[in-house]
Amino acid sequence: MDGALFPHKPPYPIQSKRPPPSQSSNQSIKFSSATLHLPPPSPPSFPLDSLLHHLVHLSSPPPRHSNSAAARFPSLEVSTDSSSSKPILGIEIENERNGSLKLLCKKEVVLVNSIVEQPLTGLSRFFDSVKSELLRTDLVSLVKGLDDSGHWERAVFLFEWLVLSSNSGALKLDHQVIEIFVRILGRESQYSVAAKLLDKIPLQEYLLDVRAYTTILHAYSRTGKYEKAIDLFERMKEMGPSPTLVTYNVILDVFGKMGRSWRKILGVLDEMRSKGLKFDEFTCSTVLSACAREGLLREAKEFFAELKSCGYEPGTVTYNALLQVFGKAGVYTEALSVLKEMEENSCPADSVTYNELVAAYVRAGFSKEAAGVIEMMTKKGVMPNAITYTTVIDAYGKAGKEDEALKLFYSMKEAGCVPNTCTYNAVLSLLGKKSRSNEMIKMLCDMKSNGCSPNRATWNTMLALCGNKGMDKFVNRVFREMKSCGFEPDRDTFNTLISAYGRCGSEVDASKMYGEMTRAGFNACVTTYNALLNALARKGDWRSGENVISDMKSKGFKPTETSYSLMLQCYAKGGNYLGIERIENRIKEGQIFPSWMLLRTLLLANFKCRALAGSERAFTLFKKHGYKPDMVIFNSMLSIFTRNNMYDQAEGILESIREDGLSPDLVTYNSLMDMYVRRGECWKAEEILKTLEKSQLKPDLVSYNTVIKGFCRRGLMQEAVRMLSEMTERGIRPCIFTYNTFVSGYTAMGMFAEIEDVIECMAKNDCRPNELTFKMVVDGYCRAGKYSEAMDFVSKIKTFDPCFDDQSIQRLALRVRENLES
């Protein structure tokens, strides 16, 4: 192995030995805090105050109006600038262009003008003041008049007032008014407004037309009110009017979004066939989208094959939906075959087609290939859009390739593709993970200048970034600021909070937030369960994790690849290797789909448990499915081979890194140094360290600890102290592992006086010795037969650390007595 392996990176040393310097040259080097150039403790890694200040400043809270519909119905966030952006009507019947306005009588024209002249905040009071006049007016014509004149928001506020009056018994709503209202809000995509107001209307008392019912079904689907949609659909079939093809497509969408409803979807399809309704592209794409959400690859392929066998010719929309199935699962080979079939059938690919291909590559770990799709699209005359770029940027961020992500972001802007809020959120997330707060602030400003104000998802991103141990107070603060800026939590927010508290190690807060979520009217979904699993994975509580999985299944939810990945993490953290094996066997038996993420987690779980055989099996399984390992996988395999002295296999991993065109990172070189240290070639390890110091990959604490460990194992304590001095000169503070390595080295050499120097140095530098520190010293005395010295050392532990645990001292004293008696 030589420098040719990675020609553009720090070369590996070719020197096999380096004679130690003469002892006389090292006499002056002594372990002492006076010889160490310790830097001050690092500041907090995430300066939240400054970042939060900018986010609050840039966030524009949604307007609140005490007398508007939004005040009584928080979901009624319709446009509030209509009074300034729309001209006030001075309606003259004879020259009005809108046909419906010509039908208004003079009294109704005056009323329309009066409504238009009122500020939105004063509409409720105005309606109350002209209540008797409104009740004598043709309300259908009045609502149409407001809508046709461009003031649909005022028509909605009028309808809201009518609903309140109807509930108080002052009037009976006309079914035509409801139909017009539903059409207006459907046209304007105001589904949450529609769903909120419709909850106040006893729909069972009205018979509406099929178009209105279909729009209401769509509103329920968009707002997650699936049970209401299903009840309404069943009532339509029982009472009329008969559902149309569009209605059936909407109810298919309802079942697809609701989840765990594949049999019901098949039942709806059979019902459509029995009524002679021919499937269109929306039917097919909706069914395939349902498969994508649930990971139903086999069902999707069977449904698509059946369609074609019946003579159906898929169009771009249907093919895109099929691509989404494979894209979500990361099965890029199937996605490529779909793209090939489209070309063979002369079916034009659009930006959505390529976006799904990008998603497939990303899910399979091929971020470079995903970026290559952008060039492919351009050559074929299809311009990549914000979704395309955002998907790849997010993939780079998750792979730890922040610089590539930022480079692509700026290339996106240069190409004339305007980033959207999702793009900025992805960039903010990857910058936050690396604590690059100054760049985050610049990105927030850039976001605002491009007309993308921070939204709820931006705040959710900020909450997620606070999910580190000990940062639960920061989570609380960000959540308070989020609400003060007018962003009420949605289900995604609650899921993010549960996950963030879990990562902070605050399982109590995570459970509390789950309770708040249900009280707020949000039902748990797969993401919620995964957030709970994430909290349990941090603690290794695999028993509770298994209960969560059982609860999911009992409620009809199908655990996803994320669910099983988190269970693997639970087992790994909890040391339950048999649990890892059970999931591995289910994957091999075909019960769980072997996605890129799941197999990657399987390998990492085995690595965490130091299970060599399990890691090798997972690595073989990973490559068997055609997935591309990332540097985390390669580094894990390199490390476990090194730990087990399997140097030929370790060199094979290094060769695979080169063949895959990947760049070794600092973790790779740290593992390589560890390999040399384990072989006793500490000088080679130092050569790599010296080369790293001159490269862009600057050595870290692990790098120096590894070389120090090598020298200590060889008894070259003066060289180890020299490395420690160089480390601190570079601004890297030693940790407990560093000090314990010196204790171990001095103990092996019988240099007990120096050990006390190390412990005193630890105390001076705010690094408390742990039980292992003292245990190594006690064992060293015992091995040397110095039992009385060992007991003397135990008796003065409190002088080194007055807060050291009494039970630990008793255990150490017992250890000395047991050694003496053996």
Curated annotation (Swiss-Prot):
Transit peptide start-stop: 1-77
Any one Gene Ontology cellular component term annotated for this protein: chloroplast
Compositional bias ranges of the Pro residues kind: 8-22
Record field: transmembrane: none
Positions annotated as PPR repeat: 209-243, 244-279, 280-314, 315-349, 350-384, 385-419, 420-454, 455-489, 490-524, 525-559, 560-594, 595-629, 630-664, 665-699, 700-734, 735-769, 770-800
InterPro entries the record matches: Pentatricopeptide_rpt, PPR_P_subfamily, TPR-like_helical_dom_sf, TPR_rpt
Subcellular location: Plastid, Chloroplast
Pfam families referenced in this protein's UniProt entry, alphabetically: PPR, PPR_1, PPR_2, PPR_3
Annotated spans, Disordered: 1-42
GO molecular function: mRNA binding
Positions with biased composition (Low complexity): 23-37
Keywords: Chloroplast, Plastid, Repeat, Transit peptide
Main location: plastid
UniProt entry tagged with the keyword Membrane: no
PANTHER family assigned to the protein according to its UniProt record, in alphabetical order: MITOCHONDRIAL GROUP I INTRON SPLICING FACTOR CCM1 (PTHR46128), MITOCHONDRIAL GROUP I INTRON SPLICING FACTOR DMR1 (PTHR46128:SF329)
Family of this protein: Belongs to the PPR family. P subfamily.
Protein's name in the database: Pentatricopeptide repeat-containing protein At2g18940, chloroplastic
Classification lineage: Eukaryota, Viridiplantae, Streptophyta, Embryophyta, Tracheophyta
